[in-house]
Amino acid sequence: MFRLPIVKFFSRILNRATITIVLVALQVLWLLWAFWAFTTGRVWLNGLLKALSIVIVLYLVRKDENSAYKIGWIVLIGLLPLLGGALYLAFGNKAPAKGLRTRMRKVEQAHTADLAPRPDQTDTLDRVEKNLSHYVETYGPYPAWKHTAAHYFPCGEAMYPRLLEDLERAEKFIFLEFFIVKSGTMWDGIEAILKRKAAEGVDVRLIYDDFGSLLGLPSDFVIRMERSHIRCIPFNPVVPLVSLVMNHRDHRKIVVIDGNVAYTGGVNLADEYINAEQRFGYWKDAAIRLEGAAVWNFTVIFLNCWNAFRPQETDYAPYAPTHLPEGSDGVVQPYTDSPLDEEPLAETVYLNILAQAQRYVYIYTPYLAVGEEMLDALKTAAKRGVDVRLVLPGIPDKKLVFRLSRSYYVPLLRAGVRIYEYTPGFLHAKCYVSDDHLAVVGSINMDYRSLFLHFECGALLYSNSQVIALREDVLATLPQCREVQLSDCRTSLPGTLLDSVLRLLSPLL
């Protein structure tokens, strides 16, 4: 009679996530012990390690890299002169592992022609919009498109029924790429349709981040999906080893259906994103549905990632859109950013919007952990008279990161930026909207990991009707928020010191 509870108990404590965490913790403890044992009493080794730390600091000073990241490491090395240099050699390289980098670059280079510039698609844009579009097209490279209908969703539960309808209509293929997939109501509804469509002969594929989904899926998930003819790739699989490679996660949220419809935004495939489960109060998110020519960018983004790990297609033409909406509602430019190169595409898009804004910039972000360049851009826009408003969570999912986000409030408020905290719960949306003609909806947080370490995606909207829909959503959300005042930001001396340390080390958190 006690057998079932015992089995459940051991299945919980012996699952893959728990085993991985325990093994990594043991490795960290062993490495610390080994370091202590080898350095104790060995003056020559201590001197060598200190010299290594000095060399690393000099290297960082000269390196062309994000200044906040460099300062974070220099501070850490200064605090831990014996260990700091060795830690940087082990964990300081931002680039993904060589194998991952080589695979993905090879595929992307082979399909550069699929994303060739299309000047006729941007002839209706003004000069400022064309400059931004040209940048993304050149350094992405992801072209902008007319003939694309868009629909903005102000929350996950508004998006979910429409997504199910589109999945039901699939005839040729369904591609999904997500950071988090978790068993529950949302995934069960999607999985049932995917299995049925796969049985009908529809090409169904799923890329999910192995770290993001580690706690949410059974260990035999891939086997079960493949048996149902749903092909799966766990991105950058988690192994129980201390490794920087685990930093580089696939944080994208993409659905592509028959090449004609695509979704992106902040919504993952888990119950909290549609408020079927309450974790941190009400979960406020955002997503966008695209139909038409611009879907092609997301199709290529997905296929490039897929073929890097399971080579299959050499010709992407069969996956091109077959239906274009009549007329054109502005211009849409989907894009992705990755740590494969040194081009900070996602950050530059945000910086450009702030630099070019004339009247307002409204921003949704769950986290605020930025470098001096982004901080200065926010302050400078406000000082120019632009109405800059930041909306952040009122109930955090990570308390330390929440404190870090709040540590930026004082300089921003003094510059004239208005800051709001969403009191009903956790705000997870990642959006920019400016001057009624420019917006971004995507997966890109305003933190170091999203801007420099993760694989991310977004959709730029130029003079599209859904720019106004996003603006109206922000304005409807503000009355549910608490506006932060300078008087709210008083803190004790220990608190101020903690905030300063968090700011310095924010790129490493």
Model-derived features with residue positions:
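N-terminal localization/anchoring segments of enzymes in phospholipid and broader phosphate metabolism
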Residues: 1-348, 352, 356, 396, ...
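Glycine- and other small-residue-rich loops at beta-strand/loop junctions that grip anionic moieties
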Residues: 179, 367, 401
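Thr-Gly-centered strand-to-loop micro-motif
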Residues: 364-365, 422, 441-442
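Helical hairpin unit composed of two closely spaced alpha helices linked by a short loop
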Residues: 367-389, 393, 398
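Short glycine/threonine-rich loop-to-helix capping motif typified by GTGT followed
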Residues: 376, 402-406
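Flexible, glycine/threonine-enriched loop-and-boundary segments that flank and lead into catalytic domains
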Residues: 416-421
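Catalytic-core elements of nucleic-acid end-processing and repair enzymes
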Residues: 430
